[in-house]
């Protein structure tokens, strides 16, 4: 009993001693981990200027809070490595990353095992802005370059890293089609040790993208996102290279004039992704995710729809209502599909059906859109609702009866609508290509000219035209 009491006393003394040591070490590290240290580290890695308002580390909790972060183009202050107090405020830039606060929690014990285990990264109020030119190059690209100067001294790694990135860009431009080589901006080998991340959460944010060629603007607002269960081992990417993605927000496409709105989509994305390509270690250039377009999302102006409507004037003249194509297009219900993204090229991984205004649009597999220069190739079909289709058939018969008589009306109507009828509904397969804002659209089936259809109808039964005239 006495031995147990003595042991307990010793244990308490040891725990007190450990607590004092941890507190002392925490105080020491807290004094070392400040904003200048973090700024210096980041500016030594990339071609950026970093501004931070405050840093609050806690060794006991394994937590660091970083507030008021601004990342933008590099300037002379960053090149010289001056401390924050010696710098003037950053010049406002259209290319920027601003974050109100980042909270980072790690498992300190795992660091002694050469493993980085991150419990959570919480990003609050993200503000990201950049532009994309017609070649697919974005204004963030230069920020990912290695810095030429670090603390006023020429970076010995600059030429090697710069050349590696330039070679990757040349390979990217020389390759043709959709199969572009890997982006050399980041490699898994730059991850210092096997890394796991329980969760990365974005609490509110917005992204603004300027498309230089068209002058259009893309805004992603009300952003909520998460990456969970990240598992990356740079030495074993075949088995440790995955993460679970979750993202939602409103995507709005605006014209060069700020009041011109093309579309507004409420989106959700989720699924398992591979951050790196296993063979090369570079960022995976071909991300595939499950995307849901929410009910009520709308397309205010769609050039493809307008051009498609112009090719159907013969059918419109006989009774087909094309206003459902030209009017405001509203998504009828939540629609989920797989979408691939490779070097700013969006493609349908599988057929993409969407119900709009009671009608169905289906984009065929491998249809694609280059979001950088608006080039596209889309194979699709537009199927009118049963109500509109039946009304078109009835109006067509009435119109043709007045024009050529009832005896020929049915035959002519059949000649006009048979090529574009599927399962009792008017079904228009079509192809769209070229500039998305000025597309070349053509139906994939041959449409009958009204005059030719009337001639063919009369040939089938010459006497019917006379009978039709007598019936009037």
Located regions from the model:
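N-terminal type II signal-anchor transmembrane helix
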Residues: 1-46, 51
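Extended terminal
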Residues: 2-15, 277-286, 306-307, 311-472
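Extended lipid/amphipathic-ligand handling interfaces
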Residues: 42, 52-59, 87, 99-116, ...
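N-terminal leader/targeting pre-sequences
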Residues: 47-77
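Secondary-structure transition motifs
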Residues: 68-228, 297-324, 441-449, 457, ...
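Short regulatory "switch" loops immediately downstream of catalytic or recognition motifs
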Residues: 69-82, 131, 230-232, 251-253, ...
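Flexible, solvent-exposed coil segments and beta strand-coil junctions
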Residues: 84, 185, 245-252, 315, ...
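Short, hydrophobic/aromatic-rich segments at coil-to-beta transitions
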Residues: 200, 240-247, 344-350
């Amino acid at each position: 009993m006495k031995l147990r009491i003595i042991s307990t006393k010793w244990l308490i003394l040891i725990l007190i001693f450990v607590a004092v040591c941890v507190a002392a070490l925490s105080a020491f590290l807290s004094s070392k981990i400040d904003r200048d240290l973090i700024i210096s580290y980041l500016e030594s890695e990339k071609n950026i200027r970093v501004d931070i308002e405050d840093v609050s580390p806690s060794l006991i909790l394994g937590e660091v809070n970083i507030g008021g972060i601004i990342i933008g183009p590099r300037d002379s202050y960053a090149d010289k490595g001056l401390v924050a107090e010696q710098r003037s405020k950053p010049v406002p830039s259209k290319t920027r990353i601003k974050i109100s606060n980042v909270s980072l929690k790690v498992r300190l014990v795992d660091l002694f095992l050469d493993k980085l285990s991150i419990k959570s990264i919480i990003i609050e109020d993200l503000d990201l802005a950049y532009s994309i030119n017609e070649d697919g190059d974005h204004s963030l690209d230069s920020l990912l370059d290695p810095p030429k100067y670090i603390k006023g001294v020429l970076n010995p790694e600059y030429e090697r890293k710069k050349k590696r990135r330039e070679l990757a860009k040349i390979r990217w431009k020389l390759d043709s089609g959709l199969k572009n080589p890997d982006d050399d901006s980041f490699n898994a080998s730059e991850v210092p040790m096997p890394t796991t991340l329980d969760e990365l959460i974005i609490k509110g944010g917005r992204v603004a993208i300027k498309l230089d060629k068209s002058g259009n603007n893309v805004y992603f607002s009300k952003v909520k996102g998460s990456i969970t269960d990240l598992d990356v081992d740079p030495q074993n990417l075949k088995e440790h290279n995955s993460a679970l993605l979750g993202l939602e927000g409103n995507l709005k496409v605006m014209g060069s004039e700020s009041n011109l709105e093309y579309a507004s989509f409420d989106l959700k994305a989720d699924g398992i992704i591979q951050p790196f390509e296993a063979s090369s270690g570079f960022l995976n250039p071909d991300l595939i995710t499950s995307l849901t377009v929410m009910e009520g999302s709308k397309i205010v102006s769609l050039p493809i729809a307008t051009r498609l409507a112009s090719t159907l004037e013969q059918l419109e003249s006989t009774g087909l209502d094309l206003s459902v194509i030209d009017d405001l297009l509203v998504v009828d219900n939540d629609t989920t599909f797989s979408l691939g993204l490779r070097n700013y090229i969006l493609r349908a991984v599988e057929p993409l059906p969407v119900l709009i205004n009671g009608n169905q649009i289906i984009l065929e597999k491998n249809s694609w859109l280059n979001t950088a220069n608006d080039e596209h190739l889309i194979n699709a079909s537009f199927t009118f609702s049963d109500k509109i289709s039946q009304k078109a058939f009835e109006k067509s018969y009435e119109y043709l009866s007045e024009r050529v008589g009832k005896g020929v009306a049915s035959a002519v109507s059949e000649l006009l609508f048979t090529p574009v009828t599927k399962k009792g509904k008017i079904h228009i397969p079509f192809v769209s290509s070229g500039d998305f804002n000025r597309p070349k659209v053509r139906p994939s089936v041959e449409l009958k000219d009204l005059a030719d259809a009337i001639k063919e109808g009369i040939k089938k039964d010459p006497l019917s035209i006379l009978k039709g005239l007598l019936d009037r």
